[in-house]
Amino acid sequence: DVVANADGQVVIGEVNQDATAQNIQQRGGGFIDKMIELLQADGKTVAVAGNEFYVNNATGADGTEADADVVIQVAVPAQTTVELCSNEAQAILSKDNCIAIFGSNQTAAEGVLAANANLNVLGSDAANGDVIGVGFDAGSIIKAAVQDGTFLGAVTQSPLMMGYYAIYALTAAANGQELEDVPTDGYWYDST
């Protein structure tokens, strides 16, 4: 376990395309909060640094950037482009103590991969020093990175079911029925 055996502080990065869209806020915040929970269960102190929205909305961080065992470094580019996400990811991946990074949607994940094209630090073997990268979405660039081991894996949604629920909701609304939120599943995939 890279975190358990670390000689000093380690960094886990997260790149979000923005801090305003609710789906990205929830996805990014969910990653941060679950990571804090898991790290603290292993006895680690955690700080969240970077983008103000994500820092202020993180739940349970118990360390400062100066003294935490793990810093979750959250970056949001000035605009939503792969190139600017790549710049943010490069800044995180260039840290000697970066052990993992998450791109929270297709744009951010492709930005992480573009950053890696220059740095060549991502891989699936943390024990040998690879930075573990994961993404969100199933575009061809991300799927290829999962298949070749650059990304350990990624999470995707079910567009078919999202379309189905959209038609269901439209029909219900047209018939005057009250609508409720419909949760949709996410699915992890890797090279296996």
Regions inferred by a protein language model and the residue ranges of each:
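A residue-level marker of the well-folded mature domains of exported/periplasmic proteins
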Residues: 1-192
